[in-house]
């Protein structure tokens, strides 16, 4: 967090950071709500001298040291559905939190019901849910400035022993063991990276120069057998001159520019049943997914795909 009150960052897992009356130059009232802990009401934020970086513990220490701020106990247990917490939510302009993933869809609905701006943590796969994806498609929710190719790190709770976790589930930074989570930030606050155009090659250039063996040297891109679109297995392999529909991995969303592409839909809702196309035993069965032909009478089932279309086709 930089030394000015214009840039604020969220607290750790399990907390809810809500900003109220943030149009004031001093951000006069902000409310932080902790599940099962006191609510921390920040009435005043001073500028921090210097241009150095501060970690969250240092920021929290300075906020607590300000006598104009106060700790007050919650009457309940901090459940976001309680009248008490909804009252705090109504006062806020921006909510920053790590909501319970098991109640994520209900939590997001509450934020939209109250027309709140937010920056929240989401499991990467949650964005394919039928309640969440339509919000992404309608440009009402999008991925923050985080990468699908990286996991978020969380400080390990005292009751959790990192040594009992698989090595792949932890990461040590400067001697501190963090727990890894396949999560991303999602938000309805616009940000500059969201409007940076993807630099892309044409289809011909991709087939000749792509760094991916799945693309380079082929005569053409694969087409799905159960939906009319081409398969683009990598975001950087999207052909800049293709005007039709394309299926891309969900990791495309951290590079999605709504000025450059239109989101048409998702394979979960658009894939035609393979039972109407191919004989049983020639493909792996499962929920709605796109399939491509192997060329030997069998078919490959793909991971979830987002269907997009270039906006150049409309210009």
Language model segments and positions:
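Class I S-adenosyl-L-methionine-dependent methyltransferase catalytic core
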Residues: 1-96, 100-315
